[in-house]
A protein has these predicted regions:
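Alpha-helical transmembrane-bundle signature of multi-pass membrane transport and export proteins
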Residues: 1-398
Length: 398
């Protein structure tokens, strides 16, 4: 487990460094505008929608550890090519988009295989704690990565950020090499579409998995409605400059770290079902705080809102992932993980488009109220489900 946690920290740090460094380099070195930055972001997002399900099948048919090794090597190779191109002065927007796509392919495979591998490394009773350690690593990388990338590019140029990201990716591979994966009995090969159908039916027909999926989709739509409106709202209505907007957004990363640190105590202090519902309820409180800025336009209130948005959902991620891993048969963990990833990523552009449409026609305030409605909906879905009354984790399926 220690090797997986350390590898995850290195891989997440490499990802966050590169995600932050690429648009900075594109603007400073290549004169990219909003359209080009949007195209780069699209290139880094498409693999999640196109390849998560194939990677889920792969993770259920072969070694999950070696899938992670291969995918992290692919991401490391894309970072190395970025580094060489930066040193040679040969970077272009087209090359950044291509390498961003390739690197994201590696990220997808790693992201699908890691939660599928974890239940084989720890007993069911230790799953929540293990997921907490993985999420703490992700939270730390998310909180520190963008600031570190910006500082490196500003002080030492683009190559410095790519050097560090490449070294971190190589470290992630080395740590995975040391990890021992218990042998699994290979399943009889079947048509891929049949296996995907079985995974989808399991999620949709399961009394615990379906509300978790619907809650996550509703949360992502509401979150990206808010994201579409927040920066212009903060600058126009709250009177914040760029630096102050950045400080309010930094509350999100701080909340993630705090939530990951406190999650074990929170889970131990209440029934497991209530611990799962805790995160969605905190999201409602967070959005209510943001809506309150319509009456009291204070940046501190917006920062507190983002802190809560980091704090509650990280507890949700830990508890809901643990529940998902516990009730899913081991042979289907890869497909189920991929389906959740695909649904969540698919909800994001829908939320962003909805937020943009509402904001353009009715203003940022309407977006805030719409986002609040979405967060209330996701809390109602999970609170009205059988998940809420779980006293503890259910038994692991055979």
């Amino acid at each position: 487990l220690r090797a997986l946690v350390a590898s995850n920290l290195a891989a997440q740090s490499a990802e966050q460094l590169s995600l932050a460094a690429v648009p900075i380099v594109a603007v400073l070195a290549l004169g990219a505008g909003p359209g080009e930055i949007g195209a780069l972001a699209t290139a880094q997002t498409l693999p999640f929608l196109l390849l998560a399900l194939p990677f889920g099948l792969w993770a259920d048919r072969s070694s999950r550890r070696w899938l992670m090794v291969g995918c992290e090597l692919l991401r490391g190779l894309s970072l190395l090519v970025m580094l060489v191109a930066a040193l040679a002065g040969q970077l272009s927007l087209e090359l950044l988009a291509l390498l961003g796509f390739i690197g994201a392919v590696g990220t997808v495979g790693y992201s699908v295989a890691a939660p599928a591998l974890l239940p084989a490394l720890v007993p069911p009773a230790a799953l929540a704690q293990a997921n907490g350690r993985l999420e703490l690593a992700r939270s730390a990388a998310f909180a520190a990565g963008p600031a570190l990338a910006g500082a490196l590019v500003a002080w030492a140029g683009a190559s410095a950020a790519f050097v560090l990201a490449t070294l971190l990716s190589a470290s992630a591979v080395a740590l995975l090499w040391r990890l021992h994966e218990p042998a699994r009995t290979p399943a009889a090969p079947r048509h891929p579409l049949v296996e995907l159908r079985d995974g989808a039916l399991l999620v949709w027909q399961h009394a615990l998995l379906r509300p978790i999926l619907l809650t996550a989709v509703a949360w992502n739509i509401a979150w990206f409605v808010l994201q579409a409106a927040y920066v212009p709202y903060a600058m126009r209505a709250l009177g914040l400059d760029a630096g102050a907007v950045g400080l309010t957004l930094a509350g999100y990363g701080a909340g993630m770290v705090a939530g990951a640190l406190l999650a074990p105590r929170l889970v131990a202090a209440m029934s497991f079902g209530r611990a799962v519902v805790f995160g969605p309820l905190v999201s409602v409180a967070a959005m209510a705080a943001m809506v309150a800025t319509l009456r009291w336009p204070q940046g501190v209130l917006a920062g507190a809102s983002f802190f809560l948005f980091g704090f509650g959902p990280i507890v949700w991620t830990i508890t809901s992932t643990t529940l998902r891993q516990t009730v899913t048969p081991g042979a289907m963990l890869g497909r189920v993980s991929a389906m959740f990833l695909t649904a969540n990523m698919g909800a994001r552009p829908l939320g962003a488009a909805l937020g943009g449409l509402v904001g353009a026609h009715w203003g940022e305030a309407a977006c805030l109220w719409l986002a609040l409605a979405g967060f209330v909906l996701q809390a109602v879905v999970i609170a009205a489900s059988p998940v809420r009354v779980l006293p503890h984790l259910p038994a692991t399926p055979a």
